[in-house]
């Protein structure tokens, strides 16, 4: 029987099991299965996935994120905020502004601290990636993939493709509560045009600075929030002429609000909370 200590945290209800790999060890070949086991809401701790907080050669810490199906993702906005909170509160970093390595690149985090507790985290998510090769998405062309039709159950849905280190297909609808989240979501996620699958967002524009948001996450299904998805959705709204670049946009997710800005300089800034749920020790056994 193997075991490791963990902290369960969430960003707007998007929960992960966080493991401090400065102190714990899980064999590389077991990571995918352990992520699937610990995330199981019936037989494990229950979460949207598992995130490892690891040593890095290029930043104070490195984040590795696994979905609840065991697949590894390249980035996670809500996860980054929680990693930033954990790193500061557990003294893995000393400054309030520091970098985090991800498989999608290095991002900068800034934490707001009150009485040694991180109350708010701002992440510089970098510039959006808009070409097919960067998403990745099948086909050729260097122009952004904006408002292209997709036929589903005899109804056309137009989506815009944006990568924030992981791929997103953003669809604008009149009412997110009536969007085909659990039907169109998995179909588009697994469509052959996306060789690494895709996250699917449904967006309802409320006004110039607010939107409602629902998400079907690649490898996890319906979740309460998706930070990179919120960033991608704001970028898509601006590309479609629905919002203005440089303005702070409030994204209303099922789990709460994020503030997103696509700056004139090109990077996307995400601001929001991160919360600790509990600490514990998880025991598991890998069947031979």
Curated annotation (Swiss-Prot):
> Could you state one GO cellular component term attached to this entry?
cytosol
List the Pfam families hit by this protein, alphabetically. Answer: DAP_epimerase
Q: What EC designation does it have?
A: 5.1.1.7
Major location (coarse): cytoplasm
User: What name does this protein carry?
Assistant: Diaminopimelate epimerase
- Which residue spans traverse the membrane? none
Compartments, record wording: Cytoplasm
Has keyword Isomerase?
yes
Q: Which family does it belong to?
A: Belongs to the diaminopimelate epimerase family.
Major enzyme class? isomerase
Q: Which organism is it from?
A: Bacillus cytotoxicus (strain DSM 22905 / CIP 110041 / 391-98 / NVH 391-98)
Q: State the SUPFAM superfamilies in the record.
A: Diaminopimelate epimerase-like
One GO term in the molecular function aspect is:
diaminopimelate epimerase activity
